[in-house]
Amino acid sequence: MPNLRFLRGYNDAVVLGLARSGAVTRVDLAERSGLTPQAVSKVVARLIDEGLLVESGTRNVGVGKPRTLLKLVADSRLALGAQVERDELRVVLTDLAGDVLDRAVAPLPPDFDPPAFVAELTRLVNGMRDDKLLGVGLGFVGPLDHRTGVVHDATGLVKWHDVPLRELAEDSLGLPVVLDKDTNTAIVAEAWRRGEELRDAVLVLVGTGLGVGLLLDGQVYRGARTNAGEFGHTTIQLDGPECVCGRTGCIEAVHNLAARSGDLAGATAIVGLAVADLVQLLDVDHVVLAGRAVLAQPEAYLAGVRAKLPTADWLPVEVEVTPLGDDVVAAGAAMLVLSEFYGRPR
């Protein structure tokens, strides 16, 4: 029975993923999913009964009767997602399509502690509750354990050591909570909205810190302890500035020093060098740039990264700034909740 439940859930997720891209017919679903027409019919009937899909119009296909179009009922299920930076909390409400319906932003005091954070999170969430809400996702500063919901030693946050944040948030909110690194939720956002077109990608988040989210063969890569992506704390300059992590010469520290001193060209070149190393190491074909530093100077960061990437014709890499803007981490945290119910394993 568990295997049957898994198969149903997987097939449902495949069909819903295709429906997120626009109206589709049952024939489209069978051709694009690899499922049999009989399996598609069963899945579609189940999703219609659950209010997730609706029949909406027809499409003429030449000879024969028109085919019925199926449309995702995007607002049938909702989720909240939060981005926690070292100085700000952002909460967004998203639907099944990954569209942001509402948002709230509040400053966080210097060196905020867990009780103060949970209180502010609860205040913002209470202002955005909805009967169709499935849960709350948190995109937090690492290192943390995605599986246990514990924040271990959040870089730059001195009062966050082995904090059971998921448990604290669930107790306060009375809702299911999912915790992950901010870089991971950001890449989840891109993968959720793009579906199968995004398979091997890195998302570079340049905000108060610097890290990457990794999508490898269509799956978010978290590593053995769910802390993959701490790329900002790899060394790029042996005699470089001290970093908040305690080391010296980290990519994050060198970048931030250049940015604070007004050396935009130097800051973007450092990010470009780091991204080029990732591309060479992982052989990804897509790079997404995100975070407040990038959004403040998008063209400069795009140029800085593109200038450092390999130029071989057989090694094309697409580089872009996230279309989700400031919401990418929080929206991805919400989509992580949605994927727990209606997505493939991420």
What are these regions (language model features)?
Residues M1-T58, G62-R67, K71-G127, D131-K132, ...:
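ATP-binding/phosphotransfer module of carbohydrate and carboxylate kinases, centering on a glycine-rich
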Residues A79-Q83, L133-G137, A201-L205, G211-G213, ...:
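Short glycine-aspartate micro-motif
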Residues G81, L89-L93, V188, G211-L215, ...:
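Short beta-strand scaffold segments in enzyme catalytic cores
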Residues D87-E88, G207-G209, G229:
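Short, small/polar residue-rich loop motifs at catalytic or cofactor-binding pockets
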Residues V100-D200, P298-T311:
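Glycine-rich phosphate-binding loop and adjoining helix at the ATP-binding site
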Residues D182, G207, A333:
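Active-site glycine-centered loops adjacent to acidic/histidine catalytic or metal-binding residues
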Residues N227-I236:
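Short, intrinsically disordered, charge-biased short linear motifs at domain edges
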